[in-house]
C-alpha cells in the first residue's frame, strides 16, 4: 500500500521476493498462537466457587488447588502445573511443559490419581481459576470421570486461590536466579524436581506447626507429633476431618 500511494505499481510476489533477498521483515505483529488456543478452548462452563476461601474447613485431601505458572530460563519459557492440598500444603502432583496445550494440565490430574487416588473420593474438590484450561471440555470431563467436584475462583480474584498463588511466589523467590541460568528445558525440569522435593519434605512452616508439608500430613493422619520431645515447640493444631 505504501508503494501504491507513492505511485509505484509492483506485483506482491515481487515485493516479497525483494524483501527476502534484502532480509526485510514486515513489522506487523502476528497473532499470539496461545491466545488463539485460549479462545478455541474457552467455554462457558464456569463452576461455582464452592471453596469460597474456606481452605481449611474440609480437612486434608478434600480441597486441592491447581494453577499454572511461567518459568523463564535463558533459552525460553516453560510452564508448571501443580496441584496443592490446601490443608497440608503438599504438592501432590505437578507437570512441566514447553507448551500451553491442555494436555499437561490433564496429565497433572492423572498423576494425582496415580499417586494419591486411594486417599481421594467423590467429595474431593479441585479448585482453580477460570483459565481456559480449567473451563475446557477435556479438563471438565477428566474431573467428571474421576468423580471429583469442580470449583472455581471468581474472575480476576487471586485471593480465591491464595495458598496456590503463595506457593508459586515462594518457589520463584527461591529458584528464579537458578532458573534464569538454565540453558535447556531439561535443566529447568531438574531444578523444579529438586525444589518441589525439598518443599514437600524439608521446608518447615510456622502455619504447619513447624513441620514440613509431608510431616504435617503424617501428624494429622496419626496424631503423633514429631517434635513432641522439645518442650514448648508445639502449637495448637487445627482439627480437620481425618
Question: What are the language-model segments listed below?
Answer:
Residues 53-92, 98:
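An active-site-proximal beta-strand-loop segment
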Residues 1-59, 157, 212-222, 227:
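Basic, flexible linker segments flanking DNA-binding modules
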Residues 137, 144-148, 170-242:
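C-terminal domain-tail junction helix/linker
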Residues 5-8, 56-57, 73-74, 129-130, ...:
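Conserved, non-catalytic sequence blocks in retroelement Pol enzymes and Pol-derived host proteins
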Residues 118-135, 209-213:
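Acidic/histidine-rich, metal-coordinating catalytic segments
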Residues 15, 19, 51, 67, ...:
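Mobile genetic element proteins and their domesticated derivatives, centered on retroelements
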Residues 76, 95-119:
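Active-site beta-loop-alpha junctions of metal-dependent nucleic acid enzymes
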Residues 28-34, 125-130, 144-163, 179-184:
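RNase H-like polynucleotidyl transferase catalytic core
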Amino acid at each position: 500500500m505504501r508503494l501504491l500511494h507513492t505511485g509505484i505499481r509492483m506485483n506482491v510476489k515481487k515485493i516479497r521476493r525483494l524483501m527476502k533477498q534484502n532480509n526485510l521483515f514486515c513489522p506487523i505483529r502476528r497473532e499470539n498462537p496461545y491466545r488463539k488456543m485460549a479462545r478455541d478452548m474457552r467455554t462457558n462452563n464456569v463452576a461455582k466457587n464452592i471453596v469460597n476461601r474456606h481452605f481449611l474447613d474440609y480437612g486434608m485431601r478434600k480441597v486441592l488447588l491447581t494453577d499454572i505458572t511461567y518459568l523463564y530460563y535463558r533459552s525460553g519459557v516453560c510452564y508448571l502445573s501443580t496441584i496443592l492440598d490446601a490443608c497440608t500444603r503438599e504438592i501432590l502432583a505437578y507437570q512441566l511443559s514447553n507448551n500451553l496445550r491442555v494436555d499437561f494440565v490433564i496429565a497433572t490430574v492423572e498423576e494425582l490419581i496415580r499417586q494419591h487416588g486411594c486417599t481421594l473420593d467423590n467429595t474431593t474438590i479441585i479448585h482453580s481459576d477460570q483459565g481456559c484450561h480449567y473451563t475446557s471440555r477435556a479438563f471438565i470431563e477428566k474431573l467428571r470421570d474421576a468423580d471429583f467436584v469442580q470449583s472455581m475462583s471468581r474472575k480476576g480474584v487471586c485471593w480465591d486461590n491464595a495458598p496456590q498463588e503463595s506457593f508459586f511466589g515462594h518457589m520463584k523467590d527461591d529458584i528464579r536466579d537458578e532458573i534464569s541460568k538454565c540453558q535447556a528445558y531439561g535443566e529447568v525440569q531438574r531444578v523444579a524436581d529438586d525444589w518441589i522435593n525439598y518443599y514437600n519434605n524439608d521446608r518447615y512452616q510456622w502455619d504447619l506447626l513447624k513441620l514440613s508439608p509431608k510431616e504435617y500430613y503424617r501428624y494429622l493422619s496419626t496424631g503423633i507429633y514429631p517434635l513432641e520431645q522439645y518442650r514448648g515447640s508445639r502449637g495448637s493444631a487445627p482439627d480437620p476431618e481425618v
